[in-house]
Amino acid sequence: MRDISYPPIIRTAKGLFRVLGLRFQMGGTEHVPRTGGALLAFNHVSYIDFVLGGFAAQPSKRLVRFMAKREVFDHPIGGPVMRSMHHISVDRGDGAGSMDEALRYLKDGEVVGIFPEATISRSFEVKELKSGATRIAAQAGVPLIPVALWGTQRLMTKDHPRDFSRGKTIGIRVGEPMYPTGDDPVAETAELHRRLSALVEEAIDAYPAGEQPPGSWWLPASRGGTAPTPERALELDAEEKAARAERKARAAGDPDAGPDAGPDANSDGDPAVG
């Protein structure tokens, strides 16, 4: 696959990260194969996870083709950039086409990135996963590699202002590969959830204590932070979805439409999907 824009974009991003004083704390990157197809499954805590997550494959000199929602590709600036990097557009109403494209990429030996939670976790713990990651890996016959991101939420996430002040640490932990067979997608997805959750815990444990004091808003409640509990996060997600659907219905001129109306009721402005 010919890449004209991806390498210079990476160089530009690295320069920007140096300006921001970002420190990368990485582990397990040897699990990303240097050749052949592989599916990287990331947790999702930030709007820029797909920007920073690609660095998990840099030590192996691989470029990650991320699956991202269609609306990102519709943007007049972001769309051409995403297409030039050969990322994969996902239509949440009809995911068959994007799944076929991901399978083709993987069978051609590419590395594909997916966010099986589908949307950002407000609790910063791993939410329930969609089964797409295990099904795609099984059908393509490639390893499924869990990757935990930590600290990205401090820069840009839901319900909090952006903070690009200098000197933050970004944790990236790559786990050992799984080899789904597709015989039991439910069990294989549960195993992916277990592994991804364990990697997130490792990333939290390894994170500099001075940057992560008790009571930090970016810490899960279970780790002494003030982030919403998983239960409360689900409630907030539902409230956001209902409010968004109602706004869309009103904009369409339907005052009687309920909170579940609107063709894009599941779209939350989040660039990455699973």
Where are the predicted features?
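Extreme N-terminal tail/first-helix region
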Residues: 1-16
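Non-catalytic C-terminal accessory region of glycerolipid acyltransferases
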Residues: 4-5, 96-274
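N-terminal signal-anchor transmembrane helix
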Residues: 15, 19-35
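Short, structurally constrained coil/turn elements
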Residues: 18-20, 60, 108, 166
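Glycine-rich, highly charged phosphate/nucleotide-binding loops
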Residues: 23-25, 93-99
